[in-house]
């Protein structure tokens, strides 16, 4: 699990560098992706081999004002597997719920995804697979005449 999780985290961090996010923003998104990938491996494939697909999309909007430029980046990340699927998505998303209590799983994966991302949507069908779509909006303000950018709150 850890090698696949690390690869996913590095790939997503690499994707994010083009929009110059803060270290905290990168870590939040990497944590959410890590949880989604771990869920696919542990629960979707039940520790058997399988493919976990990660798609990253970026939509950028630039709004120019009198003395500043606002950069808005909407990041969408989709983590998909062809694993066993989830019978009850609502139950699976409850904090502390785990389908593998024997493995000392905390059942906090979806809770962490929801904490670190703006939206988390789950689609799943038993025996077909699961798709987790997460979004996060990042903003930064560039003062006109300033070569550097300042992140907005």
Predicted regions located by residue number:
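Conserved beta-strand-loop-beta-strand hairpin that lines the nucleotide-binding pocket
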Residues: 40-153
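Generic recognition of short, well-ordered alpha-helical segments
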Residues: 7-10, 91
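Conserved polar catalytic motif of the HATPase_c/GHKL fold
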Residues: 35, 39
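STAS-typified acidic loop motif
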Residues: 1-5
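Conserved short strand/loop->alpha-helix "switch" segment adjacent to the catalytic nucleotide/phosphoryl-transfer site
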Residues: 9-34
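Loop/helix-junction capping segments adjacent to catalytic residues or to phosphate/diphosphate-binding pockets
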Residues: 6, 23, 86
């Amino acid at each position: 699990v850890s090698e696949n999780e690390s690869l996913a985290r590095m790939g997503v961090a690499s994707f994010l560098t083009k929009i110059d996010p803060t270290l905290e923003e990168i870590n939040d998104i990497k944590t959410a992706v890590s949880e989604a990938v771990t869920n696919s491996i542990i629960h979707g494939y039940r520790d058997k081999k399988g493919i976990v697909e990660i798609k990253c999309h970026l939509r950028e909007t630039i709004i120019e004002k009198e003395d500043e430029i606002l950069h808005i980046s909407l990041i969408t990340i989709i983590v998909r597997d062809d694993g066993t699927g989830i019978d009850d998505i609502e139950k699976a998303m409850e904090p502390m719920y785990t389908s593998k209590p024997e493995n000392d799983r905390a059942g906090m994966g979806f809770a962490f995804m929801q904490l670190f991302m703006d939206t988390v949507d789950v689609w799943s069908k038993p025996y077909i697979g699961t798709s987790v779509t997460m979004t996060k909006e990042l903003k930064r303000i560039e003062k006109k005449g300033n070569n550097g950018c300042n992140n907005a709150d």
